[in-house]
A protein has these predicted regions:
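Bacterial N-terminal signal peptides
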Residues: 10-19
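Acidic, Ser/Thr/Pro-rich intrinsically disordered cytosolic tails and loops
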Residues: 2-9, 22, 26-498
Length: 498
């Protein structure tokens, strides 16, 4: 797999990971806890009491409390109290929303805003009209005890809803995938949640028998139709949908785990090496006529694919030319403790193209007929020189592969089908992980966060398959195995001669 394909694949996973990161909030406070107490009266009015804890991470002027309003609804008899700071407040009607702007100060003169590290408790109490709906057959309370208008996560929530009568009611907590818990106790509906994320909500919905309300309900909405069965059907449909989504999510989780076995199957089928009875009887002699760079191309390693050359191929070719007398090596004292090594070109007769190209690269750093490694090192510190060397080195590697390892020759030494299958699996895994991850983020269901984690894990497996060296997924042929063993034995025979 070439570098561009790998880079594209890694870019996909980066986009996926960035898409699931939370957006940085502009607010400078957190909300560790909230307590909400709601009283439903016989005339349809509800009274809301809120106790909200704030922790400020920097200095601040105050906070907002936005109360969304639907048609004909209104907030009345508002009272505000603050512990932990001096305060003022202002009510702003924004059309469809009542905004309560609470200014916070750390001095009685109300001239200095609060500082970082301040903990404040805000109390709000107000009457809310036309929230309860009265139908022909039943009354309904549908109220968000914590709404989705908040721009900060809530650490923990406790809420209680008190109805006119102690009789247990039919009730539901929405959304159906919410982790909030509810129970009926002493005629009250108790709700708790270990946290509500920004943009999420916790809603209570209850059917109230008409006999619990007075004959006159001026503070309720009156709707001339039967709605009890419709509400029950709607809630059941939502619950059934969530059950289905959660089941599908669990199946997808198991499927992603099962698919992780495919790379192991590919390795088992295509990556295991053939057994040989090779014995290095002649290890005291150079046992192969293949160029050192050829053997290097057949060798794998961390981050190195079979068939690619690295700097060791370049170095081994230099050593081979020295041993064959084509290059000479010399040194002279640089200081009392160090020496400078030089190469000299003795002959280029009979050299192969890749060897002549190597000599030409070295001659770029020739001074007075000697190739100085110290001078070469100094030159490569300059960006232009380093880039020029890298380009010539890359051309040298590619020309060698074209001459000695064209595809039909390479296939005689290495079977890369398994490596190709690893690449295909990696691409497919990334695409599937992105799809599953995106769906688990944007389609809410119980366990969606777990499915997102499985998608991330599966994407990591896909990336690993894309970047792993080809020697893991592929395998040497018998000819390649023997050639590689011969080449490794011959490395010990290469010595620099003077």
């Amino acid at each position: 797999m070439n570098f561009k394909n790998k880079a594209f694949a890694i870019l996909l996973i980066l986009i996926f990971c960035l898409s699931i990161l939370p957006t940085a909030s502009a607010v400078d406070y957190s909300i560790p806890y909230a307590n909400v107490d709601i009283q439903v009266y016989e005339d349809g009015l509800i009274n809301v009491y809120e106790e909200i804890d704030y922790h400020f991470d920097s200095s601040a002027n105050g906070v907002y409390r936005d109360i969304p309003l639907k048609r004909n609804q209104s907030v009345e008899n508002l009272r505000v109290y603050v512990e932990g700071a001096y305060y003022d407040y202002q009510i702003i009607d924004q059309g469809g929303m009542e905004r309560i702007k609470i200014y916070l100060y750390r001095d009685a003169a109300k001239t200095q805003k609060i500082t970082s590290g301040t903990d404040v408790k805000v109390y709000l109490q107000y009457d809310f009209t036309h929230v309860v709906k009265v139908y022909n057959d039943v009354a309904e309370l549908q109220y968000k005890v914590w709404g989705d208008e908040w721009e900060e996560d809530l650490g923990a929530l406790d809420a209680v809803i008190r109805f006119p009568d102690d009789t247990k009611l039919e009730y539901w907590i929405n959304p159906a995938y919410s982790d909030a818990k509810a129970k009926w106790s002493d005629g009250n509906l108790l709700i708790s949640s270990d946290g509500v994320s920004e943009g999420s909500y916790v809603e209570a919905r209850a059917l109230i028998p008409l006999e619990e309300l007075s004959s006159s309900t001026p503070y309720a909405q009156h709707i001339n139709k039967n709605a009890g069965d419709e509400i029950r059907s709607m809630q059941k449909s939502e619950a059934d949908t969530q059950t289905l989504l959660s089941t599908v999510g669990s199946i997808v989780n198991y499927l992603l785990v099962a698919l992780c076995a495919i790379p192991l199957a590919i390795y088992y089928k295509f990556g295991r090496e053939p057994k040989t009875d090779y014995q290095g009887i002649y290890e005291h002699e150079p046992p192969t006529n293949d160029p050192p760079a050829f053997v290097n191309a057949l060798m794998g390693g961390f981050g190195k694919n079979i068939g690619d050359l690295d700097q060791k191929a370049f170095q081994a070719t230099i050593m081979d030319l020295i041993n064959r007398g084509k290059l000479g090596v010399d040194s002279e004292d640089d200081t009392e403790f160090t020496k400078t090594t030089f190469l000299t070109v003795k002959s280029t007769d009979g050299l192969e193209r890749y060897e002549r190209e190597l000599v030409d690269i070295l001659r770029t750093y020739e001074l007075n007929g000697r190739i100085s490694f110290s001078y070469m090192q100094d030159c490569l510190r300059e960006e232009n020189q380093a880039r020029s060397y890298q380009d010539r080195y890359n051309n040298w590697c590619q020309n060698f592969k074209n001459d000695y390892l064209p595809e039909e020759v390479f296939d005689e030494y290495f079977d890369q089908k398994g490596s190709d299958y690893m690449m295909y699996f990696g691409i497919g895994a990334l695409i599937l992980a992105i799809i599953v991850g995106a769906l688990s983020i944007f389609i809410h269901f119980r366990g969606s966060f777990i499915t997102t984690l499985f998608a991330i894990f599966f994407a990591i497996v896909g990336v690993a398959c894309l970047i792993m060296p080809s020697g893991i997924g592929g395998k040497y042929t018998l000819k390649g195995k023997l050639t590689l063993k011969d080449g490794r034995n011959s490395r010990s025979s290469l010595r620099i001669t003077h």
